[in-house]
């Protein structure tokens, strides 16, 4: 960024400022739970993106997403392996069951670009 200030006598001064973008993490959390008619017992979550060596991807899911304090279950390894998750939580305090997913990506020591492109899946 270059700033030039000039006065009425045509004298000027210039300042140059350099900004460096340093994004080291990104987090996503659904704001609204996906509605469920009955207690969800299993889910499959897939995440597309670029996850080079040195970065850390963390993923959590809950089946009581309408609760004031949902019971988050770590599904990071199952997402990385493309495996189904069976919920351990069997309780809710809200009127209805609902599924939420949240993910966090940390740059860590990665030297390549890392990003989350999409999050998808299903539950039953």
Where are these regions (language model features)?
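Beta-strand-rich ligand- or partner-binding modules
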Residues: 1-124
């Amino acid at each position: 960024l270059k700033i030039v200030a000039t006065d009425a006598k045509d004298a000027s001064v210039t300042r140059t400022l350099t900004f460096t973008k340093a994004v080291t993490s990104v987090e996503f959390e659904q704001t609204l739970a996906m509605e469920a008619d009955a207690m969800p017992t299993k889910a499959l979550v897939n995440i597309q993106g670029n996850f080079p060596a040195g970065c850390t991807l963390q993923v959590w899911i809950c089946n009581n997403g309408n609760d004031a304090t949902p019971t988050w279950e770590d599904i990071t390894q199952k997402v990385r392996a493309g495996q189904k998750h069976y919920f351990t939580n069997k309780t809710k305090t809200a009127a209805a069951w609902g599924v939420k997913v949240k993910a966090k990506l940390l740059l860590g020591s990665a030297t390549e670009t890392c990003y989350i492109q999409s999050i998808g899946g299903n539950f039953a």
